[in-house]
């Protein structure tokens, strides 16, 4: 199942649960109390039959729970009526998210300029200083990894959280000269976070690349303008994340940590294929699946200051 279907299924389950809750409340209240009042008291229904009990004075006796259920029904119906607008807006929001699954995809930015400008998806991690290098200069791969973790699990983390975890569980050791995380350390870190992922080289045919991307949930790709500068300019090597492959338009949803203007845009998958950095040992990492029981990290929450979604 690809990531687009996962997001749609989550939204569908949410809506079904909301509708089921409303119907159950209404049906329970309707079944519990008949709503008839003959002037002398409430009549209860039992197995579809009216039930009433008369006292020695011939008056209909009101069972204790009849009043409780009647009051419960009145209160619940009032709650439903009072929240009708909220429920309607929630339904509209769910429908909007189903029509635009990219709203559930995380796309963090790495640079300090974006953070200074108050851009959405930017954060204070950009100014973290590591062994003579700022995160904003090398954090593209870690942003992509955080995108995957936040999008495909029920948890969240910041790119800096991902940096710290990669340092802990892999051989990742950034330096002044080389700060970017390598393919092997990326794969190890994601595997320990519960992801089934593979490292891949550029296939001979574009059609094969299309099939691989379509079958994956998300991907991290390494692009370079030296291979093709149709989309990326003056880029020696840069990690970006792609997801939600649309076969009808042959486009993917782009998470570009270094480009606040191009981030969260739909681009031709062909641009990605042509720009794959061929001098690298690998060109892209495919995320095939996520297994909660394999997640050794279970990190949840972003404590860094950031611009939000």
What residues fall within each predicted segment?
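Active-site-adjacent structural segments surrounding the nucleophilic cysteine of cysteine proteases
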Residues: 35-177, 298-300, 306-309
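Gram-positive cell-envelope targeting signals
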Residues: 1-37, 45
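Stable alpha-helical elements in mature extracytoplasmic
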Residues: 136, 141-148, 158, 162, ...
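Mid-length scaffold segments of soluble, non-membrane domains
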Residues: 168-201
């Amino acid at each position: 199942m690809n990531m687009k279907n996962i997001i749609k299924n989550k939204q569908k389950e949410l809506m079904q649960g909301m509708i089921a809750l409303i119907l159950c409340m209404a049906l329970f209240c309707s079944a519990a109390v008949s709503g008839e009042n003959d002037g002398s008291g409430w009549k209860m229904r039992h197995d579809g039959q009216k039930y009433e009990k008369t006292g020695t004075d011939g008056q209909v006796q009101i069972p204790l729970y009849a009043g409780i259920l009647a009051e419960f029904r009145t209160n619940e119906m009032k709650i439903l009526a009072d929240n009708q607008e909220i429920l309607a807006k929630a339904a509209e929001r769910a429908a909007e998210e189903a029509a635009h699954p990219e709203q559930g995809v995380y796309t963090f930015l790495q640079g300090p300029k974006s953070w200074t400008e108050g851009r959405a998806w930017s954060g204070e991690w950009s100014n973290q200083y590591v062994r003579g290098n700022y995160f904003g200069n090398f954090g593209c791969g870690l942003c992509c990894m955080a995108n995957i973790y936040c999008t495909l699990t029920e948890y969240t983390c910041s790119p800096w959280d991902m940096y710290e975890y990669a340092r802990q569980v892999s051989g990742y050791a950034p330096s002044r000269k080389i700060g970017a995380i390598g393919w092997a350390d990326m794969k190890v870190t994601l595997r320990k976070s519960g992801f089934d992922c593979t490292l891949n080289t550029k296939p001979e045919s574009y059609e094969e690349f299309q099939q691989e991307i379509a079958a994956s949930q998300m991907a991290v790709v390494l692009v370079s303008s030296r291979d093709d500068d149709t989309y990326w300019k003056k880029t020696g090597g840069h990690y970006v994340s792609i997801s939600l492959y649309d076969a009808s338009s042959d486009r993917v949803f782009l998470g570009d940590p270094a480009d606040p203007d191009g981030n969260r845009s739909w681009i031709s998958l062909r641009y990605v294929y042509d720009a794959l950095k061929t001098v690298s040992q690998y060109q892209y990492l495919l995320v095939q699946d996520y297994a909660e029981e394999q997640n050794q990290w279970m990190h949840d929450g972003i404590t860094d200051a950031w611009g939000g979604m």
